[in-house]
Swiss-Prot record:
CC cofactor note: Binds 2 Zn(2+) ions per monomer.
Cofactor(s) named in the record: Zn(2+)
Entries under PROSITE patterns matching the protein: DNAJ_1 (PS00636), DNAJ_2 (PS50076), ZF_CR (PS51188)
PANTHER family in alphabetical order: DNAJ HOMOLOG 1, MITOCHONDRIAL-RELATED
Protein name: Chaperone protein DnaJ
UniProt keyword Translocase, yes or no: no
Zinc finger feature spans (CR-type): 147-225
Comment text on domains: The J domain is necessary and sufficient to stimulate DnaK ATPase activity. Zinc center 1 plays an important role in the autonomous, DnaK-independent chaperone activity of DnaJ. Zinc center 2 is essential for interaction with DnaK and for DnaJ activity.
Domain J per the UniProt entry, residue ranges: 7-72
Alphabetic keyword roster: Chaperone, Cytoplasm, DNA replication, Metal-binding, Repeat, Stress response, Zinc, Zinc-finger
Positions bound to Zn(2+) 2: 177, 180, 199, 202
Amino acid sequence: MPASKRDYYEVLGVDKKASNDDIKKAYRKLAIKYHPDKNQGDKAAEEKFKEATEAYEILIDEKKRSMYDQFGHAGVDGMSGGGGYDPSAFQGFEDIFGGSFSDIFENLFGGGFSSRSSGFGGRHAGPVRGSNLRYDLQISFVDAVYGKKAELSYTRNEKCSECHGTGSESGSSKRMCPDCKGTGQVRQSTGFFSISRPCPTCGGEGSIIEKPCKKCGGNGLERKKQRIIVTIPAGVENGKRITIPSQGNAGQAGGDYGDLFVFIFVQAHPYFERNGIDLYCAVPISMTQAALGGEINIKSLDEKTLRLKIPAGTQNGKLLRIRGEGVPTGIGRKGDLYIQIQVQIPSKLSSNSKKLLQEISAIEGENENPNLIPLKDLP
């Protein structure tokens, strides 16, 4: 045994009187922490995993543990798996993990684990769906309310026009990968486990291109400009995502296209605001219009002329409503338009206007001791 080999009890972090349950719990913690598929490319983690596995194999076995306690590493030289695969090592192994060991690692690493065969999943030979794309579209307030058709221009991966996505030159073909025998996976034994990884020779494809396409370099894809017409529905809200199926990147090995996600960003309007399906605006009226009432013309969001009735005695800030002039819902109805009244008080008066107001004041009488108004009664 190499002099540098650490004490097995120290490796697992238990004392020499530790029970089998203590050893199992300690190993479980280390196995999950340092497993190679959780720490891909981390050689230090892989070595710690092998070290913990070797220590567990010795200390969990009563006879091996007794020999180790008496003679140290020299007494158990050659008794551990040494990184190889030993089916007998799985006897009672699921008990360490409180049930299905494969379920635990499937949750940790994304599926496909089998302690005896297939390992931790990974890329398999076969069609791969293309990735989704995002497009941010800025539209006007008016277009958001009433809808529109918009032309989108963007670049995406498409199947190579020369090889039609095969990656091979015309007349050429693919051959089975000699290393993985067409499975796209290679198996590596580590302690208790047999782990499958994507084949480095074929990149997990299961086959090798003999003569790569000169246009795409063998990946079967090329970048192209794409132009599509998208219907923006009436009433679309700011931040809404619209999904356009199959307008994302092309897949590989016959895989489907991904989707295009169009995110809507609505510009502010100088005169109108929106709350759900209702629209809001503000109009000024004179103090005589507010006092006497009457009718005025206002412009709607779509430039129609609307007639608005002002009740006599209308107060500043009052909300008036015109039904059916709000946001279309797409189900045959529309929201309403709310108009906030802003009573304009003149800052300068002509002599005649001042005289008339003084006469009104004399008739009405000025209240020098007004009572407070409850805040709930304010418009």
